[in-house]
Structure formats: C-alpha cells, structure tokens
Amino acid sequence: MFGLNKASSTPAGGLFGQASGASTGNANTGFSFGGTQTGQNTGPSTGGLFGAKPAGSTGGLGASFGQQQQQSQTNAFGGSATTGGGLFGNKPNNTANTGGGLFGANSNSNSGSLFGSNNAQTSRGLFGNNNTNNINNSSSGMNNASAGLFGSKPAGGTSLFGNTSTSSAPAQNQGMFGAKPAGTSLFGNNAGNTTTGGGLFGSKPTGATSLFGSSNNNNNNNNSNNIMSASGGLFGNQQQQLQQQPQMQCALQNLSQLPITPMTRISELPPQIRQEIEQLDQYIQKQVQISHHLKADTIDHDELIDSIPRDVAYLLKSESATSQYLKQDLKKISSFKSLIDEDLLDTQTFSVLLQQLLTPGSKISSNDLDKFFQKKIHLYEKKLEDYCRILSDIETAVNGIDTDLFGAPNNPNSTAITADLGSSEAENLLQLKTGLAAIVSTVIEEFTLFMDIAERIAVLHQKTKTLASLSI
C-alpha cells in the first residue's frame, strides 16, 4: 500500500479513478504520495470509483491525492483528458483537453481540478479571476498557477485571501492570511524560506513575528532547506526581540495583580510605577512654571499689542510727511533741471558767438548777440528786484524793532498817536518801552561783564602756567 511493488498482471482501479496495472517488464513502484509511475502495463484496466475512464497503458499505481500518472482519464465533472487530475487540481505534464471548473470558469489548461483550477495555462480563481503566473509544484514537478479565494493575481502561490507572493521558489503551502512560508502556521508565520509575507493589514516585517506583528531579527534555520524565514504579524508592528510580547503580557499581568486601591500611597507602590508618577509630577510642575511665566509676561505682551495701533498711526503719519517731502524735492529737482537746461543752452549760444568772434573774417549777426544780452539783462533785473524787496522788508523790520525799543521822539506821527491815547495808556506804553530798554541794556552789560571775566580768567590761566613752569 505504501510503496510495495505489485506483480499481478491485472491492473486494478485506484481509489479515485486512477488506473493501475502490473508491468511485464518493469517493477511497479507501488502506492506513494507523489511518486511517478513509469512502468508499462499491458492488461486491461478497470474504472475508478468516480467514473474515471482509464485508457491505454499506465505506468503503475498512481498517487491517491493527485500525483502524476501516465494514463488517460476523465474527471468527475465531465472534463475529458488524457491524463488524470488530482483531487485539488494538480496537473500532470501530459496534454489534455479543456475542462470546466466547478463554477463554470473556462480554462485552457490540460485538465480541470475539483475547484476549476487550470494547470499550465491561465487559471481562474474562485470568482473567475485570471491567474497567468506559473510556479513549480514540489510534489508533481509541473508548472501551474493557482488563484486566491477572492481572485487576486499572484506571481506565485497565493493564500486563502489572494495575497500575492513573488517568490520564484517551488510552490509551497499558504497561510490562512496570505503569508507564504515553506511551512506556515495558522497566521502565516514562515518556517524556513526566504519569502517575505505581508501581515494581515499589509505591513512588511523583517523577520518572524508574533501574533500581533512583533518582528524580530533572529534567524531560524530549517533542517530541510536552511533558508532564512520572514513573515508578517497580525498588525504589522516590528520589534527587535521575540520575547517582547510575552514581557508586555507579563507586565500587564503583574500590574493587574498589584493590590492598588484609591487609598494606596505612592510610597507603597513598586519603584517603577513610583518613578513614572514622579516623572509625571515633574512634567506637570514644569508646565505650571511655564504657565506662571507666561502669565507674568501677559502685561508686557498686552502693552505691546496695545501699542500696535499707535505705531501704525505714527508710521502712517511719517509716510504721509515723507511723501510730501519727496513731492517737494521732486519739484525743486525739476526747477533745478530747468535752470540747468537754460544755462546749458546759454552756454552753447555763448560758445558759438565766441567762436565767431575769434574766427577772422567771419560775420557776426547782431540779432543773436542782442537777444542773448537782452535775456540776461531781464534775468538780472528780476534778481535785483527780488533783492531790493528783501532788503526793504529787513529794513522795515529793523525800524519797527528800534521804534518799539527806543521810541522815535523826532517822529511827528508817533507824537500824534501818543496825544490821541489816554494818559494811562501812554504811561503803560512808556513803561513797556522803558522795561524793554532796561532788559536790553542789562543784557548788554551782562555780556560786557562776561567778556571781562573771560579776559581775567585767561590772564590768571597764563600766570598759573608760568608759575608751574618756574616751579619745575
């Protein structure tokens, strides 16, 4: 049964419809899990349990679970093939006709499996998705591509939920959540291959992980292939040691076992918890100090905020004054430019006239000379009139000050005005003039005294220097 050779000449039907028979020239290899029967049978073969139709010579007793056999048969659901398909859709290396899947998916493979998987061609998943990639089956030595439960397109073998693994290694067992190990656990942990599997939520760990995705970098050597393993955790988290999760669980258990009540004192707590509470208290005190510091600076900040409108008003006023000054400067610059242009034109005219005068035999037009000098005469007349007006204004101001200070007894107009005024007003005016005259005379005398004192101080300074030089 488990690999024993049979020598009978009459082949019997396999458990699932495989044809078996004795060989006259070669010994059969017997019943095995994946062994290939290469012997030739000459006797007739009988039908299988599920109606398989053996035809022709077969190599020997086929495997019970879909191992490769060199015989022609049909599958349980009407697929016509020259080679038999396994129970779960493993495909031998023989040419077969197209068979339909369980849910009607069309396949171009050689034979159809129980769930409609197509071998050596484009295969469809449970819900009709196409798979076009090939991997090597380690049990039957053939190329096939299997689809995930939800139709994901893997590059190699896929998991129950269709996660894609891109390894080019031989096909391996898949974890329930899409991890691709050589030998996988319930949650997709790798046992001994180099394929990195994703976690439940798509995280990529760097090593073997625990139930909640704790990743470690420890290398586990498998006795069969000695390949580094890597798999994803449930939540995709990473850790450097495999023992961290048990340590966290132990810590939580220890905390839950502590007899902590609302009446427990801090001194009665464990050192680690007491240290955490002290650090938290220090942090709170630090934040309180910062709040007090900010509260102390609130007045200054409010004053600065209140000063912003005043600063803005001052800047606006300064900007307006600066704009006016710039406009005035622009006007003056424009006037300077016009004067410079006029002087330049006059200079050019004078240069032409001078060149004509210096050139012998040239005739000079009197009109040009007359025009030039007439223009200059009018300009100088305007300037003289301006000077005379300014001088007359100065003279009037000086005479008024002199009259107010010292009076004008020889002036008949002042006498008439004084006669018209009353006696009290005349006395007040006289006192005012006398007071102003006294102030002026006092200032003059003070100036004279200051000059005299300065002269005497200079003389004393000179004598002091002379005495100092003699004493040395």
Curated annotation (Swiss-Prot):
It is a peripheral membrane protein. GO terms for biological process: amyloid fibril formation; nucleocytoplasmic transport; poly(A)+ mRNA export from nucleus; post-transcriptional tethering of RNA polymerase II gene DNA at nuclear periphery; protein import into nucleus; ribosomal large subunit export from nucleus; RNA export from nucleus; telomere tethering at nuclear periphery. It is found in: Nucleus, Nuclear pore complex; Nucleus membrane. Transmembrane segments: none annotated. FG repeats lie at residues 2-3, 33-34, 65-66, 77-78. GO terms for molecular function: identical protein binding; molecular condensate scaffold activity; nuclear localization sequence binding; RNA binding; structural constituent of nuclear pore. InterPro entries: Nucleoporin_FG_rpt, NUP58/p45/49. GLFG repeats lie at residues 14-17, 48-51, 86-89, 101-104, 125-128, 148-151, 175-178, 199-202, 233-236. PANTHER family: NUCLEOPORIN P58/P45 NUCLEOPORIN-LIKE PROTEIN 1, NUCLEOPORIN P58_P45. Functions as a component of the nuclear pore complex (NPC). NPC components, collectively referred to as nucleoporins (NUPs), can play the role of both NPC structural components and of docking or interaction partners for transiently associated nuclear transport factors. Active directional transport is assured by both, a Phe-Gly (FG) repeat affinity gradient for these transport factors across the NPC and a transport cofactor concentration gradient across the nuclear envelope (GSP1 and GSP2 GTPases associated predominantly with GTP in the nucleus, with GDP in the cytoplasm). This is Nucleoporin NUP49/NSP49. It comes from Saccharomyces cerevisiae (strain ATCC 204508 / S288c). The gene is NUP49.
